[in-house]
Amino acid sequence: MAITVYLSCLLVLSMAGLAQGIKSSLRSQDPGPQPLELKQAFTLFQIQYNRSYSNPEEYARRLDIFAHNLAQAQQLEEEDLGTAEFGVTPFSDLTEEEFGRLYGHRRMDGEAPKVGREVGSEEWGESVPPTCDWRKLDGVISSVKKQESCSCCWAMAAAGNIEALWAIKYRQSVELSVQELLDCGRCGDGCRGGFVWDAFITVLNNSGLASEKDYPFQGQVKPHRCLAKKRTKVAWIQDFIMLPDNEQKIAWYLATQGPITVTINMKLLKLYKKGVIEATPTSCDPFLVDHSVLLVGFGKSESVADRRAGAAGAQPQSRRSIPFWILKNSWGTKWGXGGYFRLYRGNNTCGITKYPLTARVDQPAKKRPVSCPP
């Protein structure tokens, strides 16, 4: 742990001033202003994230990608209206295409199935608390998972949703099998991608879900290897519902019922490190959603300097508080703030209101005994 923190500090120090120089050189098509410093930063990146390359040509290619990503990180930070910081992450040697292929949905976008329903107006409350963080209640939110090169964010988000709701309703912590959702799904496409409702349909079809311990994550799917019938179920769902695309209602449901899943545009997450992302529809298209995560809370930041102060009509040196959502990702704890990130709350940042989906958990229904009359 100490070595990792030390390397992170070295990376931050080495990035100071380097990104601006690289950004300027890319504009002028110059090979690079400070190649030695860039290579030193890249070496630190390789050590921290255990990267090695097969030949000098591949090394040179990844170094060039790293330089472009470093310049892009600075540009993203300059354009962001919140408090987000961007920089070197585990994905800094990947192109946009590689990143999207490995971590986003690969299936074509589709409509949610008719099984889910929107909650009726009679079920909505009016009062929403100022803050909510389900991580603070022991046993509700399981550890941050790492999907590796398997495009299974949809399955991990669904499993996390059921785990949290089960713990809240029955006061029983469970860690559920993502692998069962991948191996046994009839609608999802395993490690090639899927949607959260695919996972919920699988749980309904299989009459429950096994534990992670009993059916562990492999990060790959083999044909005809579904073991659902051979594994004991530890959690069940009654159905699943699609919430309205209204952030106030989503906040109320989250605070009163528990964590839900959302599917967002992950464009700005590749180089994200910490802070609140406040994007515009131009910088993060809310209609192009490609990554499912678990929404675990919301809050409001302390007063911070307004990055919008340079905009027309804004007061210089003004300060403001920023409302935000708290989201759990599936890229491991070395990404973001321990595997979590925050999005601005109130303007459908990155499409967070497009598919707010949640299961509703319940014990399996007991069949009434039937006997023939004498």
From Swiss-Prot:
Enzyme Commission code: 3.4.22.-
Cysteine pairs bridged by disulfides in the record: 150-191, 184-226
GO biological process, one term: proteolysis involved in protein catabolic process
Residues of the active site: 153, 291, 329
Pfam families for this protein: Inhibitor_I29 (PF08246), Peptidase_C1 (PF00112)
Propeptide feature ranges: 22-127
GO CC term (a single one): lysosome
Subcellular localization, as worded in the UniProt entry: Endoplasmic reticulum
GO MF annotation terms: cysteine-type endopeptidase activity
Top-level division of the source organism's lineage: Eukaryota
Signal peptide feature range: 1-21
Catalytic class of the enzyme: hydrolase
Keywords for this protein: Disulfide bond, Endoplasmic reticulum, Glycoprotein, Hydrolase, Protease, Signal, Thiol protease, Zymogen
Glycosylation sites: 205, 347
Family listed: Belongs to the peptidase C1 family.
UniProt function note: May have a specific function in the mechanism or regulation of T-cell cytolytic activity.
PANTHER family documented for this protein: CYSTEINE PROTEASE FAMILY C1-RELATED
Designated name of the protein: Cathepsin W
Organism: Felis catus
